Amino acid sequence: LLALDSAPSSQSSSPDSCVGPVICGGGGGVPVVARGGSTGLDAVDAVIDKDATSLLLASLLGASALLLLTDAEALYDPGDWEASRREERRPEAVPSPASPGEVEALLPLLPEGSMRPKAAAAARAAREGIVAGIGSLQDAAEILMGTKGTLVVPTRGGGGG
């Protein structure tokens, strides 16, 4: 959904004409390829990385913040995850605000298909100068304020630490 300040036209579809939130990116359709010598198309497995897509949109739109919302309340410390499950308690969240380097150090320890893409996108966003938040949908405003969830923030000097 792209909210524009006037009726859509070829002149008004740039990010500069947006007056509301941009919500897009995701799956759908069946990707296909033409194999050498074949006259038909074959379906291939492909998944849209919605976190990387969100980061790309944030970068293209010049966003100052990116929220990666999920059913988890924050980016949890992967070293505490299993222990917390055995002890039936909430795992410890990664201290917030976190630097891109702190989050990148956790990437190999995070589950591949769930939190790792969010953490990777958040770290890259911060390296690009965009504040990134990870947490639950109902906490979106508090994540931006830094009172809930995990914020990954650009470090001074632009290197992203």
Indicate residue ranges for each PLM-predicted region.
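C-terminal catalytic "cap/lid" subdomain
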Residues: 1-161
